[in-house]
Amino acid sequence: IVHLIMMVGGASPINPEDEDKVVDMLNSGLASAKQYGVEQVSSTSFEEWMQGEPQEGDAFEAAVAQVAKVHARCYRESELADSCVQGWHLEFLRSGEFQTFTSSAKAWQAVKAMNEASGANFFKLMVDAAHCGDSDLDIPENEAVIQELSDNGALGIFHASAKTTRGCLSTDDGWIGALLSAYARTGNMKHVFVEIFHHEDPALEALRELDSGHGIDTSDGRTYSEMVIDGVVDVTRRLNNFVSRGILS
């Protein structure tokens, strides 16, 4: 199963002047998804990575409206309603990586507007435990958003990833377990990914400059392949034990 993940660069989804550029970028990725029969697509197309300024108040509402317009255009122009693509999962990022859509609650407002603008319950919110843990919302507040997403048919892919370090899942300080459990209890959990970043990846130097915690070696003597395998085993055991406890069927 292939999942396509898209990013935007060189143009801002919240800037009306960049609308056509952003739509063209996303439509190009969606064309590839349709060509190869991809059923689930994802993107971080709320805003550009590590660019721009925080939008608050009326400016935030305008940003919500603009990203909704952009994604509704893509939905129509790429003819997603009659395609193999079954859902589009939007991922928010922590403060610093994003400036505006930096929590599950803020991102949910945008996803809700996307569905309203497209006239279809097509867009979902991807919830990454790492970005939730690095946001300004606590665990109960994120659990409440997860339930609201589920109630509205907008619960997307779950990323099992450790906050701040983005390394070994054992450094998550309880966020993965709590939010994965909240997902499972909705009865609408469908996709879970394990995500681990290399603490010396040259492409992620900007993250290490943003937060030195991202540069910590959490491997404990393992290769990164071994860390990913350990993460998959850990999450699999959690899911299997949700079944044993009657939380999942």
Where are these predicted regions, by residue range?
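Short amphipathic alpha-helical segments at helix-loop
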Residues: 14, 52-55, 92, 216, ...
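Structural motif corresponding to the early beta-alpha repeats
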Residues: 1-65, 162, 190-200
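A broad structural signal for short, well-ordered beta-strand segments within beta-sheet-rich domains
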Residues: 1-2, 85, 155
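Catalytic cores of phosphodiester-bond-cleaving enzymes
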Residues: 65-97
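A generic structural signal for ordered alpha-helices
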Residues: 11, 41, 85, 89-92, ...
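Histidine-acidic metal/acid-base catalytic patches
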Residues: 23, 27-31, 37-38, 69-72, ...
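Active-site-proximal beta-alpha loop/turn segments in soluble metabolic enzymes
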Residues: 46-59, 87-100, 130-131
